[in-house]
Regions:
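Non-ligating segments of multi-cofactor redox enzymes
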Residues: 1-234
Length: 234
């Protein structure tokens, strides 16, 4: 089994819904982006091309982050996912330096610490962040998704790294990753590339594909097909 994703850049509308869905699903703190994007402009006016390229962990078959991790915190599972044992992470950041995609983040501060602030932004007009937490009976953040904690800490520790897990907790329930389910245009297709009958495998066979940083030789499992062209919409 080799799970991964195909992203159709012709269908992608650049709405950022994938980024928001990921953040909500995985309780990521400010500044931590498991799902992100690259804005790229090429050429000179009037011959200018703009590209919006969604990014995430590529769950590489030959993952550099797994190779360099001194504690085994980064590892591959039987489905081909690149996962992390947060309890084993010592915060050395070797995985971050080794990752050719820049998709691993580091918690320099205590995640979500802004919610511990007991001072209101406007006195006698607003509740403090800490008051909001108390109202919803939470100790970390008011919109916590408890299901994230089924396979990985709901909120990660200070001085540890974190990254996309392809929503492994949702896969265990027979669901697709949150970014895939949230995409309004169906630009993201998740599947098993080792299964020739999967939609993901069929798309890779049908289209000319692109992958990021192939020179790194990590055998990434995120493929991009087509590119946005307004003429193809009509």
């Amino acid at each position: 089994m080799r799970l991964g994703m195909v992203i159709d850049l012709q269908k992608c509308v650049g709405c950022g819904g994938c980024d928001l869905a990921c953040k909500t699903e995985n309780n990521t703190p400010d500044g931590i982006k498991w799902s992100n994007h690259i804005n790229q402009t090429e050429g000179r006016f009037p011959d200018v091309k703009y590209s919006y390229i969604p990014t995430l962990c590529n769950h590489c078959s030959d993952a550099a982050c797994v190779k360099v991790c001194p504690t085994g915190a980064m590892y591959k599972d039987k489905r081909g996912l690149t996962l992390q044992d947060n309890d084993k992470c010592i915060g050395c950041r070797k995985c971050m330096r080794a990752c050719p995609y820049g998709v691993i983040s580091y918690n320099k501060q205590i995640p979500h610490r802004q919610w511990q602030d007991d001072e209101a932004l406007i006195n006698k007009g607003m509740a403090s962040p800490y008051d909001v937490l108390k109202q919803v009976n939470s100790k970390t953040l008011p919109y916590l998704n408890p299901e994230r904690g089924d396979t990985y800490p709901n909120t990660r520790s200070r001085r540890t790294t974190e990254k996309c897990t392809l929503c492994d907790h949702r896969l265990d329930q027979g669901l697709k990753p949150a970014c895939v389910s949230a995409c309004p245009s169906g630009a993201r297709v998740f599947g098993d590339f080792d299964d020739p009958n999967s939609e993901a495998a069929r798309l890779v066979k049908m289209h000319k594909t692109q992958q990021l940083n192939l020179d790194a030789n990590t055998r990434p499992n995120v493929y991009y097909i087509r590119s946005f062209n307004v003429k193809n919409l009509y």
